[in-house]
């Protein structure tokens, strides 16, 4: 029985958690130099979008392989789980961007590492409990308690991060439009620079 749980552990933390969260992080990393990434909370938005894109792709694969019922179960468990992992990835990614903005390279690297490590651990715990509850019913209650805790902490993290949002770029979107010589959208032409700061 111990070997079964070791297999679940390796599958959950290494195969699923590490691989999937690293892939999501690599996609997220493409936003680092985007002029649209000018506020800390943007990191959470980008990370959740990447996570939901991954979850949609994964769900299509599961529905195709195991049927529609599996897709329905995953829609209320795995898909929100990926979104919550994305929230925490984005939270630390946003702090990495803020640290970079302030010129704190060591903090930036540490937060970038945390933006992968924390979601890997969260994802690994989720998958381990999901695998274990399939073979031992005693894990079912623990799995759903963990799922509810993820939802609650994820929502709290989003709310707190939204309230504490800070600028992480010196260039505003308006500055970017001017630099790239893009036309300013008509509804914003009469706004002064203070509107964008």
Please provide the spans of the model-predicted regions:
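Hydrophobic alpha-helical segments at protein termini of multi-pass membrane proteins
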Residues: 1-197
